[in-house]
C-alpha cells in the first residue's frame, strides 16, 4: 500500500488505450452481474471474481482453495487468485469496444476541446459523431476540402462521381482519423504566425486553439486519445450490489449504465460478424456512443437515461460533482470515529479549560484506553476480558476511566463551525446524566445557547494530537477573537448583570460614610446588615495591598463601595483598584479624588462626590483586554473564572425580576404625539396646496414621526429609576437595548411594509398599553420579513464563507521576510467627514515600511521593519502624523503565501505570527463569520436618485465577486480639470473633463448627484457622480494600488457601519488573492501564450529568464478576478475541482497534463496527507526525534 505522506505531487492526463489495458485485470465480456440462485458473481460479468478478485478473504470461486496458506495461488479450476477481498476495491477491468466512441467531456465541454483541436464547430462534430453527416477524411485529388461535411445524399453523389479516390466516413472513427492526422508542431507554428496579424473574433479563436494545442504538445497527451477504443471498468466494490431484507437487490446506477454499454457492444460485434447492412451497423454504433456518453456523463447530451420511476441514473461525472459528490462528501468531509454528540447544558461550576462529559459517553469514547489500563493494572487478564468488563459496566471500570481521562483533552465542536473558535479543546470531567456541560464563557465563541443546542465531541488519539489540542486549542488559550484581536470570552447576560449590580453606587444607602480598617471588616458589616453592597464607605488604603497605589495614596482612606471591594478581590494585586469605569482608571491608576486624609469628615466628603457609574459589559471587556495585555494568559483565564463566579453569585443575590409594574409609561407621551400630529397635518396642508411634492411630503412625515419617537426614547430613559430592573438589564448590556425598551413603554414607532418601504402611519401604542388591531396587523409585516431574511441570510453567508475559504486556502505564512521594498500608505478610513477606522487601529501589530519620524523633534519613533505596538501607534498619532508607510500582504513577494513581516501580528494570540500559520483560512473565516450579522436588505431611500445603495451582505458579495455594482458611479479616465457641465436631454448631465493631451466627456445617468463642480481638478479614477465604483473599471484607468485600497476601504465601511470590527490584514489577504493573475498582452520572446491568464509569480519568473538572456520580456495587465473565478483559476486542479464546475476543471487539467504540487490545504486533505501548515509544514515534518541525549558540559541551563 502506498504511503500517503510520501506523495510529492499528483499528475492528471488522458489515458491511452494501452494504459487502460495495462490497468485492467481482464476483459468484462458479459452484462451479467450475479447468479440469482447461487448469489455468486457470474464469470466474465461485471462482478467476475477472476477479473476483480475473490469476494471472501483467501477463498477462490469454486472453493478448491480456502485459508491464508494458499496466498497468491491461482485456482486451476476457476482462475481466481487467492488473496484479500479488498482488492475488489482497487482492481479494474476493461471493455474492448467494437467501434471507437468519443469521450463526451472533450466533445461537449465549453469550449469543445475536440472542436478547437480540429478547428470544427461543435455542431459539425455532433453531426459526424452521431451519424448524421459524413466528414471528408482524405479528399485525394478531388475538389472536396478536408473536414468538409457531406449529407448522405451528397456522399452518394460524390461516390458515384469520383469513386474511391476520396475517403469520407462518419462516427467517432472519422474524428479519430482526423485527430491522428494532426501535426501539432505545424499547427502551433501556423497559429503563432496568424496571431501576429489577426484581430477581433479571429484572434480570440486563435488564442483559444493555441492554448489547447500547446497543452497537447507540452503534456505528451495525443489528441486521438480523446476517442476511446477501450473503456475502463471501475472496481466492483465502488459500484456495489447488496441484498436487501426482502431478497431484492439494490445496485449502483453505474452497473445499469455498464450493462447497457456491454449489451450494445456485444450486439454490434455480432452485427459486424454477420456483415449486416451499414444502416443497421451505424444505428448500433450510434447507440453504443450514446450508452458510453450516459455512462461518463448522463444528461449532458439529450435526454438522460432514466431508471425505475423516471429517475435519471447517476453517471461517473455525477459521482464527483456537487455536495453529495466524491470530493465534498467523502474526501473533504469524512465522518470520524471516536466521536459522539449530545445536548449541551450550562456548567457554571467548571473552570475555563473544563467541560463535563457524560459518563456513558466517556466510557465508549475512551474504550481502548480503558481496556489497556485495565490489563496493565491487572484488573483484566487480556484485552478480551477487559472489553467484556467494559460492556458489562463493572464498578472498577469507572476508577480506571477517571485516571485515563485525566489530562487527556477532548475537542468540542458546534455546527455551524463559522470560525476557528467553533472547535476548542477541554479537559473532560465526568458528569452524571446524558448532557454535555459547557463553560458559560465559551458560549460567545461557539454562538451557543442552551435551548436545545447539540455539540459533538472528538477524542485526539496520538500524543502529538493531544499536545496540539492542549497547547493550541485549549479554551483557556483562545481568549482573543482572530478577527479583531479583542477578547471573545467576555461575560454576558447574568454575569454582566451580577457585576453591574455589584458595582452600583447609591446615595444615602444604609451605613453611608462608615470607615473600615480592611475588606474583611467591611464584609462582616455587610453580612450583618450594617451596610449594603451599594453603600459608599471608606477603607484604609494600605490594607488593600494594591501595588499601583502611590505612597501618598497608601497613607489615606479610599472612598469606595462594599461591592467594589468585593469586585477588586478578583483582580490581580498589580492591577489598578477599579473605582470608576474610565480608561485612566483601567490603564494607569485609581484617581486621587477618591482618597482622603485620615481624620477628615468622611460623610461630608462622600455627600459632595458625584455617584460613579457601575461597570457595564464594555468596561468588563476592557478590563479583560488590559489584564491579557499585562499578564500571562493563564492569569487572565483564572480571573475570567472569578469574574464569572461573582457575576452568577450577585445576579442571584440581586433577585432581579421583571413585572408589569416595572414598565412605566411616560406621562408626556400624549403631548409629544399630539405635537407631532400637528406637524404632520401642517405638512399635509402644504402638500394639498401644491407647495411640496409627494416625495417631500413622504420624507417629512417619516422624519417627524421618527424624531418624535427619539424624543420619547430620550425622556423615557431619563425618567427611569436607577434600580429599575429593566433599566438595569439594558444599561448593563446584559439583554435588550433602549429601542426594545421604548417599544415596551413608549411607542413602537414606524414599520416597513413587505416591500421594505416605510409605512407613514406609526404605531403609537406601546406593548404595555397594547396595540389596536390595525397596529398589530401592520407590525406583522416586519416580523415575518425578519424571519425570512434571517433564513436566507444564513445560507448566503455560509456560501460566501465557502468561496472565501476556497480562494485563500493556500495562503500560509511561508517565510520570515520576503525582502520586498514596497508597502502601502495607511491613513484613517473615512466616509464623508466621519472616521470609520482610525489610523491607530490600522497601525497596531504591523511592521513599518519606512522609519516613522516625529515631525517636530525629528526623533525616530519606529524604525524600518520594526513592529508597531499599541504604545508606538498612540505615539505616532499623538505626534500628528496622518499617514504611515507600512508593510502589507498587498505588496508581499512570497509566492503561494505571505511572509511574517508583511502580515504582522497574529490577532488571535497578540504575538508575532508563526511560520506555518494558515492565515488565508483565518482571513476567510474572519470575513465570513460576521456575515450573518450583516443585513440583507438594500436600503430604499424613498425614490431619491442615487437610488438604492446596496449595503450589508449583498454589498460584500458584490465587492468580493468584483461585479458591476448597483448604482455605478462614473469615474474620470484622465487627469485634468472639469471644463463644463451641461444639461442634455432627459435630465441627464454631461461632464467634460479637459486634460493636458485629451478631453473626455461623460454622461451622468438620469437624476444622478454630481460630486464635482466646474473648475474642479480631477485625477484619473476619481468619482464624478455619486455611487459605487466598478473595481474593474478602476483597474483599467489606475493601478493595482488604487484598486486594493478601494476594495479594502469599501469592505471595511460595510462591516464598520454594522458595528463589526475586522482586522485590515484579513481583507488584504483576500484582495491579494483576487489580484494574483496577469493577462498576457504581448508574449515577447517568452514561452507564454498571449491572452492567457498567468500567476504574477510565473509571469515574473518567465520574464526574468528572458531578460537574463537579453531578449524581449512579455507584457501584461493585472486582472481583477471575483473570488469564485479566482478559486477556479488556482494552480491546483484538485482544489478547483472540489470547489465548483468539477467536470470542466478536470477536462482542462487532463488535457494540459497538469501537475498538482499539493501546496494548499485542500489538496492535501483530499489525498489524505497532513496539511502543509502549522506542525505539518515540511520543515517541521523532517525533524527526527533524537535518542535520549545526556546534557553536555557546554549546555547552559535555562532559567
UniProtKB/Swiss-Prot annotation:
<feature type="binding site">
    <location>
        <position position="449"/>
    </location>
    <ligand>
        <name>Mg(2+)</name>
    </ligand>
</feature>
<dbReference type="Pfam" id="PF04983">
    <property type="entry name" value="RNA_pol_Rpb1_3"/>
</dbReference>
<dbReference type="Pfam" id="PF04998">
    <property type="entry name" value="RNA_pol_Rpb1_5"/>
</dbReference>
<keyword id="KW-0548">Nucleotidyltransferase</keyword>
<dbReference type="InterPro" id="IPR007081">
    <property type="entry name" value="RNA_pol_Rpb1_5"/>
</dbReference>
<feature type="binding site">
    <location>
        <position position="78"/>
    </location>
    <ligand>
        <name>Zn(2+) 1</name>
    </ligand>
</feature>
<feature type="binding site">
    <location>
        <position position="902"/>
    </location>
    <ligand>
        <name>Zn(2+) 2</name>
    </ligand>
</feature>
<dbReference type="Pfam" id="PF05000">
    <property type="entry name" value="RNA_pol_Rpb1_4"/>
</dbReference>
<dbReference type="GO" id="GO:0000287">
    <property type="term" value="F:magnesium ion binding"/>
</dbReference>
<dbReference type="InterPro" id="IPR007083">
    <property type="entry name" value="RNA_pol_Rpb1_4"/>
</dbReference>
<feature type="binding site">
    <location>
        <position position="75"/>
    </location>
    <ligand>
        <name>Zn(2+) 1</name>
    </ligand>
</feature>
<feature type="binding site">
    <location>
        <position position="899"/>
    </location>
    <ligand>
        <name>Zn(2+) 2</name>
    </ligand>
</feature>
<dbReference type="Pfam" id="PF04997">
    <property type="entry name" value="RNA_pol_Rpb1_1"/>
</dbReference>
<feature type="binding site">
    <location>
        <position position="818"/>
    </location>
    <ligand>
        <name>Zn(2+) 2</name>
    </ligand>
</feature>
<dbReference type="InterPro" id="IPR045867">
    <property type="entry name" value="DNA-dir_RpoC_beta_prime"/>
</dbReference>
<dbReference type="GO" id="GO:0006351">
    <property type="term" value="P:DNA-templated transcription"/>
</dbReference>
<dbReference type="InterPro" id="IPR007066">
    <property type="entry name" value="RNA_pol_Rpb1_3"/>
</dbReference>
<feature type="binding site">
    <location>
        <position position="62"/>
    </location>
    <ligand>
        <name>Zn(2+) 1</name>
    </ligand>
</feature>
<dbReference type="GO" id="GO:0000428">
    <property type="term" value="C:DNA-directed RNA polymerase complex"/>
</dbReference>
<keyword id="KW-0460">Magnesium</keyword>
<keyword id="KW-0808">Transferase</keyword>
<feature type="binding site">
    <location>
        <position position="60"/>
    </location>
    <ligand>
        <name>Zn(2+) 1</name>
    </ligand>
</feature>
<keyword id="KW-0479">Metal-binding</keyword>
<keyword id="KW-0862">Zinc</keyword>
<dbReference type="Pfam" id="PF00623">
    <property type="entry name" value="RNA_pol_Rpb1_2"/>
</dbReference>
<dbReference type="GO" id="GO:0003677">
    <property type="term" value="F:DNA binding"/>
</dbReference>
<dbReference type="InterPro" id="IPR042102">
    <property type="entry name" value="RNA_pol_Rpb1_3_sf"/>
</dbReference>
<dbReference type="InterPro" id="IPR012754">
    <property type="entry name" value="DNA-dir_RpoC_beta_prime_bact"/>
</dbReference>
<feature type="binding site">
    <location>
        <position position="892"/>
    </location>
    <ligand>
        <name>Zn(2+) 2</name>
    </ligand>
</feature>
<dbReference type="InterPro" id="IPR006592">
    <property type="entry name" value="RNA_pol_N"/>
</dbReference>
<dbReference type="InterPro" id="IPR000722">
    <property type="entry name" value="RNA_pol_asu"/>
</dbReference>
<feature type="binding site">
    <location>
        <position position="453"/>
    </location>
    <ligand>
        <name>Mg(2+)</name>
    </ligand>
</feature>
<dbReference type="GO" id="GO:0003899">
    <property type="term" value="F:DNA-directed RNA polymerase activity"/>
</dbReference>
<comment type="similarity">
    <text>Belongs to the RNA polymerase beta' chain family.</text>
</comment>
<dbReference type="InterPro" id="IPR038120">
    <property type="entry name" value="Rpb1_funnel_sf"/>
</dbReference>
<comment type="subunit">
    <text>The RNAP catalytic core consists of 2 alpha, 1 beta, 1 beta' and 1 omega subunit. When a sigma factor is associated with the core the holoenzyme is formed, which can initiate transcription.</text>
</comment>
<dbReference type="InterPro" id="IPR007080">
    <property type="entry name" value="RNA_pol_Rpb1_1"/>
</dbReference>
<dbReference type="InterPro" id="IPR044893">
    <property type="entry name" value="RNA_pol_Rpb1_clamp_domain"/>
</dbReference>
<dbReference type="GO" id="GO:0008270">
    <property type="term" value="F:zinc ion binding"/>
</dbReference>
<keyword id="KW-0240">DNA-directed RNA polymerase</keyword>
<feature type="binding site">
    <location>
        <position position="451"/>
    </location>
    <ligand>
        <name>Mg(2+)</name>
    </ligand>
</feature>
<comment type="function">
    <text>DNA-dependent RNA polymerase catalyzes the transcription of DNA into RNA using the four ribonucleoside triphosphates as substrates.</text>
</comment>
